[in-house]
Regions:
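Short, Lys/Arg-rich N-terminal segment immediately upstream of the first membrane anchor
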Residues: 7-21
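Acidic, low-complexity intrinsically disordered regions
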Residues: 14, 110-114, 155, 171
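Hydrophobic membrane-insertion alpha-helices, especially the h-region
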Residues: 22-40
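Core segments of small alpha/beta cavity-forming domains
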Residues: 36-111, 115-116
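Exposed beta-sheet edge and beta->alpha loop/turn motif
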Residues: 120-188
Length: 188
């Protein structure tokens, strides 16, 4: 009888251990998925903010001659040095230099992308559009522009809509845009 009781007790002990182990495994898997989901959402949100704010700031530097030192919050310094539109704006050769730009309607669309919590590089396809620019030619140039190009020259030229492949890198816990490669120029 004693051996039978021990086997009977061992059977219940084994069932109890397997029950606890299976529940711990399920809880661990659920917690792992929650942590992965949290870090995915955090990375996607940070990348979204960096791209939207960075591309808007880039357009402001090009059109409104804003301070270009703000771009380092969003872009790597090496990219800023290679970006011809930003460099032309800094040098005073922007197509918008003779215009007082008061505002713009900046729009950025992003495709779906996946970033694992441990990833330090992200690739995103974006479409940048600026359908409306609020501004006029500076007073000193108004008569000259109207004489040379007609009345439509009083308003700033349209921004070329583009589709880009953007590569972002995570440096010191912050995402920065490393490169923008033009995929295609889009109709405005």
């Amino acid at each position: 009888m004693c051996i039978r009781d021990r086997e009977y007790n061992m059977q219940y002990l084994r069932r109890l251990v397997w029950y606890i182990a299976s529940r711990l495994l399920v809880i661990t898997l659920v917690l792992g998925l929650m942590v992965t989901g949290f870090y995915y959402a955090m990375n996607v949100t940070n990348i979204n903010v960096v791209l939207k704010d960075g591309m808007a700031r880039r357009a402001q530097v090009i059109m409104m001659t804003e301070d270009s030192s703000e771009l380092t919050k969003y872009f790597q310094e090496s990219f800023i040095q290679r970006d011809p539109q930003v460099q032309n704006a800094i040098a005073g050769y922007s197509a918008y230099k003779d215009y007082n730009i008061r505002g713009m309607d900046h729009r950025l669309e992003m495709s779906f992308f996946w970033v694992w919590p441990w990833d330090t590089v992200a690739r995103v396809t974006i479409v940048e559009r600026i359908p409306r620019i609020d501004g006029r030619v500076k007073g000193a140039y108004a008569d000259q522009y109207v004489a040379e190009q007609g009345a439509s020259a009083l308003y700033p030229p349209a921004w070329q809509s583009m589709k880009y492949n953007a590569i972002l890198v995570k440096e010191s816990g912050k995402w920065h845009i490393r490169s923008l490669t033009v995929v295609e120029a889009l109709a405005n």
